[in-house]
Regions:
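Bacterial N-terminal signal peptides
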Residues: 1-7
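Exported/periplasmic ABC-transporter solute-binding proteins
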Residues: 11-44, 48-229
Length: 229
């Protein structure tokens, strides 16, 4: 595993996050720095790297990611604060129109892209939707399973698939570059809670608590909303 580029010198506060949350985290920290003299050091990588460094480096103070994944990784937080909820959507390219998420099972949708249900949060949510809606068997031969959400979006943008299961954050600002997107009822998949946790063994406890407290402010909530949460 490639190690993350952790700060080499004394730091005010180190926040580690999955690369998929980079824009969200950057915007949150920018808003935070307007209210505080603390200047967090940011570290990004895949979530496997992030959790490993959080456990073993002794440098990471706060981890941002999906709560279920962080819990399974065995990280201990004191406290953990929700930033927002991820929203699963079905998106389609120009020239196509879907009136319901269930339309992905119709014959005219010949290719349906989705992230890996084993390794990707939104892939897991997508599988839960297909199972809950009773259409998993109807779509199994048309599924194109890829590694990540951005790959699904790329296929939708290029028109190489007729629809894709992705997240709202990734498609909400694409405008007329795609045909459209539709939210999937959140009752059809387990909640996707994106949040920040102050590690129980963090060295910068007071600074970390200050950042966690900021996440409950209107300014932080506005950032989360901007990113589709």
């Amino acid at each position: 595993m490639v190690a993350l580029a952790l700060p080499a010198t004394s730091h005010a506060l180190t926040i580690a996050s999955g690369a998929g949350y980079k824009k969200l985290v950057n915007d949150l920290v920018t808003a935070y720095e307007k209210t505080s003299t603390i200047k967090p050091e940011l570290v990004f990588g895949n979530m496997g790297q992030v959790t490993a460094q959080a456990k073993g480096s002794g440098v990471v103070d706060i981890v941002i990611g999906e709560k279920g994944f962080l819990d399974k990784a065995g990280l201990k937080f004191a406290p953990f604060s929700e930033i927002g909820r991820g929203v699963l959507v079905v998106a389609w390219p120009k020239g196509k129109t879907l009136k319901s998420p269930l339309d992905v099972a119709k014959p005219d949708v010949k290719r349906l892209a989705m992230p890996d249900p084993v390794k990707a949060i939104y892939g897991r949510a997508g599988k839960q939707f297909l199972d809950h809606a009773g259409i998993a068997n109807a779509v199994k031969d048309k599924l194109l399973v890829v590694a990540t959400v951005p790959q699904v979006t790329t296929y939708v943008l290029s028109g190489e698939v007729d629809a894709g299961l992705t997240n709202r954050t990734d498609v909400m600002n694409l405008g007329d570059k795609i045909g459209g997107f539709m939210e999937i009822d959140q009752k059809d998949y387990e909640p996707i809670v994106i949040g920040a946790g102050l590690l129980a063994n963090a060295k910068k406890t007071e600074e970390g608590k200050d950042f966690i407290k900021f996440l409950a402010t209107d300014a932080a909530k506005a950032v989360a909303k901007k990113h589709g949460m």
